Amino acid sequence: MASPMEAVARSSLVLAPRRRRALGLLPAAAAAAPFVLDCRRRHNGGMRRPHVSFACSAELDTGRRQLPSTGTRAVMSSCPGYVEGRMVGENTSQINMGWEARILRHLENPEFLPSSYDIAWVAMVPLPGTDHLQAPCFPECVEWILQNQHSNGSWGVNEFDSSASKDILLSTLACIIALEKWNVGSEQIRRGLHFIAKNFSIVIDDQIAAPIGFNLTFPAMVNLAIKMGLEFPASEISIDQILHLRDMELKRLAGDESLGKEAYFAYIAEGLEESMVDWSEVMKFQGKNGSLFNSPAATAAALVHRYDDKALGYLYSVVNKFGGEVPTVYPLNIFSQLSMVDTLVNIGISRHFSSDIKRILDKTYILWSQRDEEVMLDLPTCAMAFRLLRMNGYGVSSDDLSHVAEASTFHNSVEGYLDDTKSLLELYKASKVSLSENEPILEKMGCWSGSLLKEKLCSDDIRGTPILREVEYALKFPFYATLEPLDHKWNIENFDARAYQKIKTKNMPCHVNEDLLALAAEDFSFCQSTYQNEIQHLESWEKENKLDQLEFTRKNLINSYLSAAATISPYELSDARIACAKSIALTLVADDFFDVGSSKEEQENLISLVEKWDQYHKVEFYSENVKAVFFALYSTVNQLGAMASAVQNRDVTKYNVESWLDYLRSLATDAEWQRSKYVPTMEEYMKNSIVTFALGPTILIALYFMGQNLWEDIVKNAEYDELFRLMNTCGRLQNDIQSFERECKDGKLNSVSLLVLDSKDVMSVEEAKEAINESISSCRRELLRLVVREDGVIPKSCKEMFWNLYKTSHVFYSQADGFSSPKEMMGAMNGVIFEPLKTRGN
C-alpha cells in the first residue's frame, strides 16, 4: 500500500500501488554540522540565517566518503533552474508591487462605489422640522446627482460598457424623482427621462437580469413620478405592462405570510407604494445602528415617511463618512474584508498579505466575541467569519451559530426569502469546519444547506451562472478534499472579475478583482515555471544516482514530484518540495525492492548497511541491486541532511537516517508476514503499517526547510507525535479501504479484512468500511483541531503540512469516479505544472 503521496506516484499510469504504511515520531538532533558556517557565508555573506538550496549542497562536505555525484553545483552561474527561477521571482515581485499595493489598500479600507439609487433616496430626506417641500436634509446628495449624470442621461454604475440595464434605469428614475422633489435640475431631468424612454423596452424584458425587488420598486416609482407631475416618457400600453409586472409579483406573494416575506418587504420598502407598507412593522427590523438592513435607501425611505432619531443618526454617519457618495450598503467593511481574505486564500496569494489578514481576523474575532450585529446577523458574513476564524486558530464555538442551525431561520431571513445561493453556500462551507464529533449545530446546518444546494443544481434558476460552478465544486470537493495547486488553478480560471454582491444595485468596484486576478495569474505562472525547472533537476538526480537503471522498480519520478507539489505548493518552498520528492522516489524504490526486487537475504543486507551507515564498508554487498539502492539512499540522505543541518544550525542527518531505518525494518516485517502467511492482530498490523506508510522518511526532512527552527524538544513533543499518529492513521485507513479488493485478490490482509475476521464474519465488508470511514472522520477532525490551535509548540507552517498531506491522502484514495479518481487527478496535476491558465481573458 502506498503512502498518500505514493498514491499519486503510483496512479493509473503505472502498476497498482502496493501495501505501504506510515511512520512515527522522529528524534531531534544535537550538534551543528561542521560545514554550516561555510554554507552560511556563501549564501548570506555573513553569519545570518542561511537559505540553503540544492545549488550549493554538493559543497557541503559531511566528512563521509563521497559517492557518485548527486547533480548539485556550487556556483550560482550553474545553479539548477529552479534556483535561478527564485532569483527571477525576486525581480518579478517588483512588477507585482502595483497590484499588491492596490489590493492592500482595498483590504485595509474597502472601496465602495457611490450608489446613485441610494444617493437619490437619501437626497429625498427633508430637513427635520421643516415643510417637506422646503429643504433637503442632505444637500450634498442633491448636488452629487446634479454633477454626476452620465453623458447619455443616465445615472448608475456601469463599469464595463455604456449599455443600459434595469439597474441603471432604476437608479436614473430615482435620481429624477429626487431632483423633481426639490425642484432643481430641470435639464438633468429632461435628459434622464429621454434615456428612460429610449431604453424602456428593457424594463419588461424578463431575460435581462434585474436588481432585487425590481418588479415591485420600478412600477411603484413610475407611479410616484406620474403623481409628481412628471411627463413620463412611455405609452399607456407600456405603463400598463409595467404595472402588470407588479400585479403578477404581488399575486405570487399574496399567500405568503412568512417572516421572510416581512423581511423582504422591509428591505425594499423604499420602492413600495404607500398602501403596501406598514412602517411600524418595517421599523421592527431596525438595527442598533439605526439602519434598516444597513441600507441607506431603505433607511432614508423610513425617514421620509416616519421620523426616527436613530435612523437620522445613521444617515448622518453615512454622509459624514462618504459625503454625497453614499454606497448601497453601510457598514460593509467586515463582509468586504472577509470576502477578500477568502479570495486571497482561494487563488493562492494570501501569503503575500499575511500580517494584514491577521489584523482583519483579529478585529473580526473581537466583533464575534461581542456578538456584533454586523457580523452575527448578516448570514453570509456570519458563516464566512466562523469558517475563516476557526481555520485560523481563533476559538469560536459552533454554538454561536445556533441562530442558523435550522433551515427555518434561513427561510425567515432576507437572504433566505430571496433564495440567495451565495449565502446558502457560505452556510454550507461553514458547516464542514468541524473540530469534534459533538457539534450538532454544524451537522444540522450542513444537512439542510447541502440539500438545498443540491436542489438548486437540478433547477434552472442558476444554470449557466458562475455561482453554479461554485456550488458544484463545493459539493464535490469539501475543503478537506482539495489540493492547493488544483484549488488555486480552478479558482483563478473560474474567477469572475465582474462579480458583485447580490444587492439592490451594483456597488463593488471591479478593478480590485482585476488586480487580484492579475497578481494570482502572475504568481501561478511563476509557480509553473518553478515546478518545471524542479522536475529537470530531479531527472538529473535520478540519472546520476542510476535509479533509472534499476529493473525491478517502476519509473515514478515525475509522479513522485507531483505528489510533493500537491502537498507543498508555494514556489518559494523549493527546497522542501525537492527534498520531499526525492524522498518519495526513494521510498518507492525501497517499496519495490522489498516487494518484488529482493530476497530475504538481500533485504537483511540492506538493513545492515543502513544500520552501519558511515561504516557501511564493514558490510559486504550481497548483490548489485543492494549496492545500487544503498548508494542512492546514502548519497541523497546525506545531501539532504547536510542542507537541513545548515538551515537548522545543528546536525539533523542522523534523525533522517533513523527514520529510514524504521521504515526499512517495517517493510521487512511486512515482507516476512507475506512469506510466512502470518495473520497479524489488528494491533500488530496498525503498529507496523503506520510506519510503512512512509511519512517518516518523506515529511520530517521537508519540515526542516519550512523556514522554522525545529529544535529537539519540538520534534520530541507529544503534539508532534500526535500529529504523526493522526495523519498516519488517516492515511493508512484511507489506503486500506481503497485497496481492499485488489489486496484480497493478492491474498493480502489489511484493516478492512482484519476487522471482518475479528468479528468472526458477523460484520460485512461494507460495514467494516463504514466503521473505518467513521474512524477516519474522527481522526480528521482531531487532526484539524491540532493544526489550527494556536497554543501548541509546533510552528504553524509545519502543522499545515500535515493538513495538506491529509488532503493529498484523501483526494488520491477517494473511490469516487471522474475527477476524484487517481487517473483524473494525475491529469489535473499535470495540468497544474504544464498547461497555461485559461482565464476569462484568454
Swiss-Prot record:
SUPFAM superfamilies: Terpenoid cyclases/Protein prenyltransferases (SSF48239), Terpenoid synthases (SSF48576). Residues 1-56 form a transit peptide. Mg(2+) 3 binds at residues 735, 739, 743. GO terms for biological process: defense response; diterpenoid biosynthetic process. A motif (DDXXD motif) lies at residues 591-595. InterPro entries: Isoprenoid_synthase_dom_sf, Terpene_cyclase_plant_C1, Terpene_synth_N, Terpene_synth_N_sf, Terpene_synthase-like, Terpene_synthase_metal-bd, Terpenoid_cyclase/PrenylTrfase. Induction: Induced by UV irradiation. Mg(2+) 1 binds at residues 591, 595. Coiled coil: none annotated. Binds 3 Mg(2+) ions per subunit. It is an enzyme of class 4 (lyase). CDD domains: Terpene_cyclase_plant_C1. Expressed in roots. Keywords: Chloroplast, Lyase, Magnesium, Metal-binding, Plant defense, Plastid, Transit peptide. GO terms for molecular function: magnesium ion binding; syn-pimara-7,15-diene synthase activity; terpene synthase activity. GO terms for cellular component: chloroplast. It catalyses: 9alpha-copalyl diphosphate = 9beta-pimara-7,15-diene + diphosphate. Its EC number is 4.2.3.35. Mg(2+) 2 binds at residues 591, 595. Disulfide bonds: none annotated. Belongs to the terpene synthase family. PANTHER family: 9-BETA-PIMARA-7,15-DIENE SYNTHASE, CHLOROPLASTIC (PTHR31739:SF22), ENT-COPALYL DIPHOSPHATE SYNTHASE, CHLOROPLASTIC (PTHR31739). 9-beta-pimara-7,15-diene is a precursor of the phytoalexins momilactones A and B. Phytoalexins are diterpenoid secondary metabolites involved in the defense mechanism of the plant and produced in response to attack (by a pathogen, elicitor or UV irradiation). Momilactone B can also act as an allochemical (an antimicrobial and allelopathic agent), being constitutively produced in the root of the plant and secreted to the rhizosphere where it suppresses the growth of neighboring plants and soil microorganisms. Involved in the biosynthesis of momilactone A and B phytoalexins. Catalyzes the conversion of syn-copalyl diphosphate to the phytoalexin precursor syn-pimara-7,15-diene. The Asp-Asp-Xaa-Xaa-Asp/Glu (DDXXD/E) motif is important for the catalytic activity, presumably through binding to Mg(2+). This is 9-beta-pimara-7,15-diene synthase, chloroplastic. It comes from Oryza sativa subsp. japonica.
